[in-house]
Swiss-Prot record:
GO terms for cellular component: actin filament; axon; cell leading edge; cell periphery; cell-cell junction; cytoplasm; dendrite; endocytic vesicle. Residues 167-211, 333-455, 488-556 are annotated as: Disordered. Residues 1-59, 108-167, 269-330 form the SH3 domain. The modification Phosphoserine is found at S80, S86, S224, S458, S469, S510, S514, S580. The keyword Coiled coil applies. Seems to act as an adapter protein between membrane proteins and the actin cytoskeleton. In collaboration with CBLC, modulates the rate of RET turnover and may act as regulatory checkpoint that limits the potency of GDNF on neuronal survival. Controls CBLC function, converting it from an inhibitor to a promoter of RET degradation. May play a role in receptor clustering and cytoskeletal polarity in the junction between T-cell and antigen-presenting cell. May anchor the podocyte slit diaphragm to the actin cytoskeleton in renal glomerolus. Also required for cytokinesis. Residues 580-635 form a coiled coil. Homodimer. Interacts with F-actin, PKD2, NPHS1 and NPHS2. Interacts with WTIP. Interacts with DDN; interaction is direct. Interacts (via SH3 2 domain) with CBL (via phosphorylated C-terminus). Interacts with BCAR1/p130Cas (via SH3 domain). Interacts with MVB12A and ARHGAP17. Interacts with ANLN, CD2 and CBLB. Interacts with PDCD6IP and TSG101. Interacts with RIN3. Interacts directly with RET (inactive) and CBLC; upon RET activation by GDNF suggested to dissociate from RET as CBLC:CD2AP complex. Interacts with CGNL1 and SH3BP1; probably part of a complex at cell junctions. This is CD2-associated protein. The keyword rRNA-binding does not apply. GO terms for biological process: actin filament organization; actin filament polymerization; adipose tissue development; apoptotic process; cell differentiation; cell division; cell migration; cell population proliferation.
Amino acid sequence: MVDYIVEYDYDAVHDDELTIRVGEIIRNVKKLQEEGWLEGELNGRRGMFPDNFVKEIKRETEPKDDNLPIKRERPGNVASLVQRISTYGLPAGGIQPHPQTKAMKKKTKKRQCKVLFEYSPQNEDELELTVGDVIDVIEEVEEGWWSGTLNNKLGLFPSNFVKELESTDDGEMHDAQEESEVSLTGPTSPMPSPGNGSEPAPGSVTQPKKIRGVGFGDIFKEGSVKLRTRTSSSETEEKKSEKPLILQSLGSRTQNVEVTKPDIDGKIKAKEYCKTVFPYTGTNEDELTFREGEIIHLISKETGEAGWWKGELNGKEGVFPDNFAVQISELDKDFPKPKKPPPPAKGPAPKPDPLAGEKKTFPLKAEDRDEKSLLEQKPSKPAAPQVPPKKPTPPTKANNLLRSPGTMYPKRPEKPVPPPPPTAKINGEVSTISSKIDTEPLSKPKLDPEQLPVRPKSVDLDALVARNSKETDNVNFDDIASSENLLHLTANRPKMPGRRLPGRFNGGHSPTQSPEKTLKLPKDDDSGNIKPSEFKKDAGYSSKPSLSAPSSASKVNTAAFLSPLELKAKVEADDGKKSSLDELRAQIIELLCIVDALKKDHGKELEKLRRELEEEKAMRSNLEVEIAKLKKAVLLS
């Protein structure tokens, strides 16, 4: 059967369950088929209880204690007893083995610790500590926390609030030995026993002490070797009894001697120093407070806590975080200024003998010595602080998610719109569409020949282009041919009186006037309706305007010799072309109006889409912030 100790309170729900409280011990516990439940006996009542509310008590040392007396009663140990009796003699009080078992039980006592600092429990399973209490240590549960019993109550307590008493059990055994010695060897001992409280004589023989050890029951303990151990322990008792007298007589002299011992050891070992790189203010009494650039004498790097060193600064010893200082050599400790580099060393650096002398003669109190020994058992230590970063961390995706919901990312600049091609004026009107197009991110559609409306069949585009190029050349360069260039070769010849040339000019039209009329008629008719800007625009459809110029010039030369019927037909053809051109202009204006309306509608749609996109971006950024907050909340919970 196994025993369990209760760690948490539990109230019974059913009749077959036990009501348990913290610290109670349940006997004769056995496991049940039902998972998570045990059955045991408490206060004469047997019942069930949950296994996660209790903890098993390990009893590995008890069977060994029970077997020890059996092993010691073997014949081999009796032979060693005979050897001792032959050497030291038989004690008058006889041998009584009963006190021996009590002494062994005391020897197998669990280790104890003494409370150095008061502690108030933060949880139900912790012990309340008062300075001076003695706790029986059961086990080390985790780093920094032990389990033990105090005033018959089991619980946890911090290990750095107590000091382990290693010699407590030996002292109790020594006291038990002295009591048993008085009861066994006091009345019949042939020599006075030094354990009665009287001071031993300077030349006293230690024979009675050895006999006392045998009479106490040590004859069953592994031969004569243990006997010598008992002798040394009795001598240590005498030294302990003499130690208070020495302390009273010498006083502070012993303190100076104790102070000089670590200094002598320090001379053998190389001294270590470290320079502070960040200021630090101590939060506890055993911590050092320093500024940046100070030199600390490093005493030890092992303080029982990771991240903390022990050192001395301005005559005060204490601990400090190791990431606030950098270890340096002994040569560099004389140059605490970090701004200037150290000058080249001309020789070995002088040793700080005066400082060492001051350290040797520095008086220390008993309380200071206790504080030194208890540096590792300080109440609490803050975690070593992290060195602040020298430069700000670059923005990450997580940082972008934490932006405020109202902040928007800067927009990328839009691509500049290329300048539209120059547009021509129609009937002297300035086109306002080009100015609107510049403000819109749309490019002006080009009027390709394929997109133009279908012309009537009577309109000849090539003839119109040739004619326009001819008129442009006449207007721009004043290339109107004179009448002399248009006369026939025989016009200046002498004529016969009273006769004219046969049927040449068709009814009395003078040769000098007819060419001019033929030139003026088309010019006057066309110049009233067609402007040079239209000719420039129409000329853009021609692939080779330079080649059509000579042909137009030849047409002008030949038109001077056309008959009136031909001129009339040509004028009618020109009128038909004018009407078709007017239709084309109307269609183009209508198309431009339609395109302008489409652009306006398209711009409105784009603006609406932009607004909706901005709203979606804002909603998404808010959603990402909410998701980040939820993730943090889940991680923290």
